Amino acid sequence: MSAQKETLGFQTEVKQLLKLMIHSLYSNKEIFLRELISNASDAADKLRFEGLAKPELFENDPELKIRIAFDKDARTITIADNGIGMSRDEVVSHIGTIAKSGTKSFFEQLSGDEKKDAHLIGQFGVGFYSAFIVADKVTLTTRRAGEAEAVRWESHGEGEYTLESVEKAERGTEIVLHLKEGEDELLNDWKLKGIIRKYSDHISIPIEMKKGNSYGENGEVIVSDEMEAVNSASALWTRSKNDISEEQYQEFYKHVAHDFTAPLAWSHARVEGRQEYTELLYIPSRAPFDLYDRERKQGVKLYVRRVFIMEDTEKLMPHYLRFVRGVIDSNDLPLNVSREILQESKDIDAIRAGCVKKVLGLLEDLSANQPEKYAEFWKEFGQVLKEGVGEDFANKERIAKLLRFVSTASEDAEPTVSLADYIGRMKEGQDKIYYITADTLAAAKNSPHLEVFKKKGVEVLLLTDRVDEWVTGSLFEFDGKALQSVAKGALDLGALEDEADKEAQKQVEEASKPVVEKVQKALGDKVKEVRATARLVESPACLVAGEHDMSAHLERMLKAAGQKIEGSKPTLEINPEHVLVKRLAEESDEARAGDLAAVLYDQALLAEGGKLEDPASFVKRINKLMLELSV
């Protein structure tokens, strides 16, 4: 076997990550051992899975374990496993590069704030690189199960690493950390065992260390090379809830989610009946940096009778719950289950439906009993949960109850208003839930469409998330009350208007016919129609979409996304009581009337967040009218 050594350079992103990580995570340096043990555990899971089809991969060594050792004289710590191991190509792809979607987004989000960056780095999954927090040289020797050749990887964590082919009798991976100056406290039996019990007690295979020295009856030191398991070595989710501490639940979450922060909440249950399975599902406290990446994988691991099968399968959790982390362990699925089988499996459908109910129940409990925690959840994951209104018809009503919004009754910009809250505050005679969609909260609050609602003291929901158009396109009513956009269709306040209001509006419409016709003629085919309205109090005009047309806000979003759409023409509603409209009605000069009508239209377009087709002409008209007024 050739032992020729090859020197290669790290991918640029790896160099950046190493530098950032060593600086940002040093205050929590103990996590290096958790991360390396977690990787070793994953390698054991992969061997178990591949060994189902190829038992020969176990090479007559079926007892999977992780071993930790230290050498005070050499100042090294060794982490060894007999899991699946890696081939030469796998070493290069897993360690020399970061082959992750969202890498660019990750680096863009780094702020320079040490605490925030540490959280982001933790989310990204530092894994193997965490070794360089405490080591100035790392030597990794690995042989993939079933292969003859082993490979040794070595680096000082700077710009380069070396690779060479070596001999290795046992399959699996051995990592030797050559500690930096000042890290000698880690070369201690008690210290390492404490770290293992703190962070990795839940790992389902034994993590072994030497028993350590003991003392005889006469005080003599008895040196023992016997190995002992430091951890409990049982799958945490198989234990009774009463036997698991809150800290153990949190540490297991950090292992399974590769997250540094404690979870917000979790659900642990054993389900019996037609399907028998155990679920341990977590709601994270922070959103990952790539939450909105549609290609991002899901975060729930599937086990069958405690044998890891796969992760990141959308069949286990719907896309709108992609933030959920945890494990599902089935007693009934076959061990040789594949992604193809999952696509057709009614058993998996039943498990998924049950787990979705558990997660929604967990969120319902938070919203009812821990509103402050639920507010934290909503801030991080609210926009994603909203996707479920359109994706999950069976649970639409449950999801709708969990939605939170800002409204005209809100004291600040925090979305705390539920649809049930809104209905509880509805005016006598009100039969609709009114809302407006806009690009920003300021644009929504100051929209001319709200003026009559403010006048009558009617609450309006202010929807500014991009996903809100999807929500209102799927949720047509809640608790028997229709959802109605205040910027679409003719104004219908129902019983909120008395007969006197309706009669007065009829008279205004009749009296306004000449000015309506004048504006219609001036604007031509720019608008579907012009009409007098009672929805305006302070503004001269506003644009309204047809009842069944796409909203102007959605139109803008689709165009910004590069979609070619034929937008429908809006209706221009004018306020006959406004001084500008009265001035236009009195204007006898056709050209000036045309300028005034065009300005009314452009102002209405700007007020709803639209973009002028010809800004220069708008400026000229405004300048011209201002000069005439100053004469």
UniProtKB/Swiss-Prot annotation:
Molecular function terms, GO-annotated: ATP binding; ATP hydrolysis activity; ATP-dependent protein folding chaperone; unfolded protein binding
Keyword set includes Nucleotide-binding: yes
GO cellular component, one term: cytoplasm
Keywords: ATP-binding, Chaperone, Cytoplasm, Nucleotide-binding, Stress response
Region described as C: spans on this chain: 557-631
Family matches, as SMART domains: HATPase_c
Stretches the record annotates as A: 1-339
Keyword DNA repair: no
Pfam families, alphabetized: HATPase_c_3, HSP90
Annotated stretches, region: B: 340-556
Compartmental location: Cytoplasm
Classification via InterPro entries: HATPase_C_sf, Heat_shock_protein_90_CS, HSP90_C, Hsp90_fam, Hsp90_N, Ribosomal_Su5_D2-typ_SF
Biological function: Molecular chaperone. Has ATPase activity.
Oligomer and partners: Homodimer.
UniProt family annotation: Belongs to the heat shock protein 90 family.
The protein's name in its UniProt record: Chaperone protein HtpG
Originating species: Chromobacterium violaceum (strain ATCC 12472 / DSM 30191 / JCM 1249 / CCUG 213 / NBRC 12614 / NCIMB 9131 / NCTC 9757 / MK)
